[in-house]
Amino acid sequence: MQGACVLLLLGLHLQLSLGLVPVEEEDPAFWNRQAAQALDVAKKLQPIQTAAKNVILFLGDGMGVPTVTATRILKGQMNGKLGPETPLAMDQFPYVALSKTYNVDRQVPDSAGTATAYLCGVKGNYRTIGVSAAARYNQCKTTRGNEVTSVMNRAKKAGKSVGVVTTTRVQHASPAGAYAHTVNRNWYSDADLPADAQMNGCQDIAAQLVNNMDIDVILGGGRKYMFPVGTPDPEYPDDASVNGVRKRKQNLVQAWQAKHQGAQYVWNRTALLQAADDSSVTHLMGLFEPADMKYNVQQDHTKDPTLQEMTEVALRVVSRNPRGFYLFVEGGRIDHGHHDDKAYMALTEAGMFDNAIAKANELTSELDTLILVTADHSHVFSFGGYTLRGTSIFGLAPSKALDSKSYTSILYGNGPGYALGGGSRPDVNDSTSEDPSYQQQAAVPQASETHGGEDVAVFARGPQAHLVHGVEEETFVAHIMAFAGCVEPYTDCNLPAPTTATSIPDAAHLAASPPPLALLAGAMLLLLAPTLY
């Protein structure tokens, strides 16, 4: 797959770098007409003042505004456009705001403290999840009495179905904010708990996934944290490094299945799609990798579901509840690509995340379903260099730097892409910069690139989406969801019920639908074949 991606990107570079700006854009009437149309839409925009039967929160981990813009360019170019003019699915939501992401104790946050903010409505400390700032990192004794409750938990208490979907392990910081309370985000299994934490009764995150609340749908990675130590992985039985890790010999999947008569566990795409059409399935757990799921471009799409597919399956299951649902969907590996200074991985993950948003938007009605899209934090990721419009987002700036060497438009402030260890910066060319495994250069050496501290965007559509406005604390996201859904502490919301009900269509087409990115790559390669040879 990686070789095909290289050819695809090189082909895009050939096609786009030779492209011309559309002639109509030279005419002022083009821009005036476009703005007038946008103004007309804005004037007709009316808030939907009913309650939200359903709430979906899409969380792009590390998807700061620069990442959103770069993803827009990439998706536009992959569809044969120049790039920046082509809207993402999230761009088309009518309400947008900015969210302040700091933790109580950190100006630049991590994904644990931020998850507490946007999922529970309370800011917490760095590396802690589901607890107030009175709890201290790694101090188990400070957990009890400082737990805070997620909106997902409150939605479940209100009778709604709930689900968690992620491309990371389901025990990772962001999804854990929906169900766990821990003073250390890395306590994935009991093997990670220090002796004092075990002695003081702290539970690992995987155990809390099963024990803390009734979650109807759980989809992502993280198999090894659920099974007893030494249990062979079903997909990689000969690789002992991914065996189960639980020291107390607990099989948490079996424990979860025993709680629900209609519970089904799956670990591959085929079984997932079959479960989607089985009306007897009331609870669905799909764990598709021992730890985090693979990057989309590295997946075997006959075995590994895409985020779009997982989102659609989750929607089919939770939408069976006449009282509605709450669904958390995370594009978690956007963040991991950035931490590695690998922009290709980050941006293609963000593109797939946007595809999942588009699918949810298609399957649900804005009259009864509130959809929010946001990020937990940003990254020290930027793109510049006065590149020509239509230049590949992974391409080079048109002029050289003061050291007479080329540089990529995308650069990082720090991270493993630091390249001055030999005393001078290495040169880079188009072939190198378009390689999916290429690490963009970074100014400061770090084993892992750091988060950025700037505000992130919040996009919204549906009932009460108009409350997304201005610049707010990240905690406001949770309170909008709680108010729109009329769950604690807003059970007296006094909002009328929606008049239209979302109805998810049959999922039989899922098994036959090729993954969007693979399909797109294949189509583009066919189109570009004459220029490549």
From Swiss-Prot:
Positions bearing carbohydrate: 268, 429
In this chain, Mg(2+) is annotated as bound at: 61, 174, 330
Source organism (scientific name): Bos taurus
Listed binding positions for Zn(2+) 2 are: 335, 339, 451
Q: Tell me, which GO biological process terms does this entry list?
A: dephosphorylation
Function, please?
Answer: Alkaline phosphatase that can hydrolyze various phosphate compounds.
Can you give the propeptide residue ranges? 507-533
Similarity comment text for this entry = Belongs to the alkaline phosphatase family.
The yes or no answer to whether the keyword Chloroplast is present is no
Q: Which UniProt keywords apply?
A: Calcium, Cell membrane, Disulfide bond, Glycoprotein, GPI-anchor, Hydrolase, Lipoprotein, Magnesium, Membrane, Metal-binding, Signal, Zinc
Q: What else is known?
A: In most mammals there are four different isozymes: placental (ALPP), germ cell (ALPG), intestinal (ALPI) and tissue non-specific (liver/bone/kidney) (ALPL/TNAP).
The reaction(s) catalysed by this protein are: a phosphate monoester + H2O = an alcohol + phosphate
The molecule here is called Intestinal-type alkaline phosphatase
Active site residues of this protein: 111 (phosphoserine intermediate)
Q: GPI-anchor amidated aspartate: lipidated where?
A: 506
**Quaternary structure?**
Homodimer.
Q: Highest lineage ranks of the organism?
A: Eukaryota, Metazoa, Chordata, Craniata, Vertebrata
Q: Which CDD domains match?
A: ALP
The cross-references to PROSITE patterns, in alphabetical order and at most eight, read: ALKALINE_PHOSPHATASE
Q: EC number(s) for this protein?
A: 3.1.3.1
Q: Topologically, how does it sit relative to the membrane?
A: Lipid-anchor; GPI-anchor
- Keyword Ion transport attached: no
Identify the stretch annotated as signal peptide in this record.
Answer: 1-19
